[in-house]
Amino acid sequence: IPAAGSEGSSSCVISNDSIDAKFGVNSDLIRPKVSFLDPELTFTLPAYQTAAGVTDMIAHICERFFSGAGSSEVTDNIATGLIRALINQAPVAIAEPENYEARANIMWSGTLAHNDLAGCGLNAVPTSRAGGWESHALEHQLSAFDTSITHGAGLAVMMPAWMRFVWREDPSRFLAFADLVFGIEPVDETEEAVADAVTAAIDELQAFFAELGMPTKLGEFGLKLENVDAFLATLKANKGEAFGGFKLSLIHI
């Protein structure tokens, strides 16, 4: 499935079902020396998995875009161009599973989304990859707790929710996302106009996920409020009290 980006990334995830945990591992020792991509191998991929894969790709890009380390005009346009391409191509691939151009564009986007190209120049720490990876850390608690939850589907819920929670920490960055991806600009520079523009962009992203058949609420997984304490305990064990580029604190969740 094109999504994880394993054909070009330095990342992998290790799951331990006995303790309901998923851990991310990153090392250039994991990155393949060479890979060959054949879009025709994805023709039989079900619509749901195609949608979940596209959601994961967009999350890989957004994690880097919202790195908290400023901006780069070239990288920003690469990143948001990939998102726009995925928004355009995903519905085509779902409607026409054997559409070679759509499948090829999605597969190539998945590689570029996670081979670090979309984060060049956005590293807060030069020796680490760009981004705080907050949405991924949050989603890992869901799919570790319930292995029937597809990673991309979990991200469709967690990423927009995370964006709504933190955007005020860096409004200019979220305005850039709104403009470059959806062409949304605030009508003026007032706080209300900025909030409206950012919220509209997040709404558009969430609506796109829903259009693909992805969930938008935790309740769609059958999860309940009492499950949150277990998620937070695992998250604290893995990440500490605060983590990510926006320093998301567990006391605020």
Give, region by region, the residue ranges found by the protein language model.
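Active-site segments that bind and position negatively charged phosphate/pyrophosphate groups
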Residues: 64-204
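Conserved small/polar residues in nucleotide/adenosyl-binding loops
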Residues: 35, 251-253
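Short runs of predominantly hydrophobic/aromatic residues within well-ordered alpha helices
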Residues: 51-54, 103, 155, 228
